[in-house]
Amino acid sequence: NLLFPDGERHFVKSVRYFRKAIDDDPMLAHEVAGFYAQEGSHAREHQRFFTILEEQGYELDEFLGEFRHSLRVLQRILPESVQLAGTAAAEHFTAIMANHALESRFLDDADPKVRHLLLWHATEEIEHKAVAYDVLQRVEPSYLVRVLGMAVASLFLAYWWQRGTRL
């Protein structure tokens, strides 16, 4: 949850960089517009959730500041195509988790508002799970770039998920 707002803003930025390359595909352009809207909604709602956590005494500023810094470093050093491939990979991971959230009972005992937030988010993640991948295939179909993006996303997410469990 802690990675969502900034991560989703990064996802939108990585897709938006290639927007002109998809202008001639109205269906993909429509899907991308929906992706932007959904990711923006997710970021706003999770940011509201952060406010509640902070009101309850959770200290998020240091963690989130370090996470934002690490995203900026990746944005500086990685080519845009690898950033997009990383977004496609992260969206794949998110879709797997979303599917699990929707099909399992692990959220049954969660606070009803938290459960609603996470299930709403999961449903929308399933809806746009392939958009970043479709853009990637259109602008940079290289398997090597896709694998590199998956490696970067895997290591990045594993590190930050592990860090987030210590809060």
Tell what function each PLM region has.
Residues 1-167:
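Non-heme di-metal
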